[in-house]
Amino acid sequence: MNQTINYIKELTAIASPTGFTREISDYLVHTLEKLGYQPVRTAKGGVNVTIKGQNDEEHRYVTAHVDTLGAIVRAVKPDGRLKLDRIGGFPWNMIEGENCTVHVASTGQKLSGTILIHQTSCHVYKDAGTAERTQDNMEVRLDAKVTNEKETRALGIEVGDFISFDPRTIVTETGFIKSRHLDDKVSAAILLNLLRIYKEEKIELPVTTHFAFSVFEEVGHGANSNIPAQVVEYLAVDMGAMGDDQQTDEYTVSICVKDASGPYHYDFRQHLVVLAKEQDIPFKLDIYPFYGSDASAAMSAGAEVKHALLGAGIESSHSYERTHIDSVAATERMVDAYLKSALVD
């Protein structure tokens, strides 16, 4: 589990908003090669690796995504601040007050700043607390001496430059992991650690398994392509959603029965439930009402496979998120148990 936590820290330290994932793809390729694998980078920028199993006729496909929420420069404002366009789905208040980095395409520089509502000062603006947060009043205050559009553009900033959010990753003495982008870098870390263990311990899986690290999940078309024809089961490892009426918590693995795309495959879900009960893996079944995954994207793209979704419980999803090492451990055990099991009947 210590190595999984290390992978989480390393992954969250790399900026990877959807569409700006070259660095994290490079990290994955380098890490997998060091483990002794031969990863393949897809045309879209994802990274895949395959472990040949005892059954090489029917295959499994397991995914986690390493792209995250982010933003992009929409315009340079007359006062030198930046107007934003969001990448991924989240309300503006989820990023208000967050430190950020502008990745300047023309120079390769990284410029720091803070995301704020325009009328931030409560000493000046009566509506500082009541104004609706919208694209028109949310902006980046650059950490540079700029007071107008010309000065900002002189820094090389242009429309289309990506903006990443400070993850602020913290692991507490009580076992909590607090960070942005635990969705879905927790799952990616779990897959990396299992791949490490399988290689070091020379474990042979019962079924040939493709591990896919996707980079477009947050905008709806992650690992929905490059699925080998032999694949019959597709497992997305992604976050479990917490809130009112939810069973998911920060201490168990969450198995999704339905999200916004509809129900997941019943027999596959029950296969996971039986494994969890047999191996005393703490789990919760749940519905994620406003949610889609790589697996649901694959189904929408026409994949003819059994599909399932599970993951660690993530509190305050798409904001400053939190989970606990107990949930990470339960999720890792669940994925491991599945990968060592027979195919779903």
Predicted regions, residues:
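N-terminal hydrophobic/helix-forming segments and targeting peptides
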Residues: M1-D345
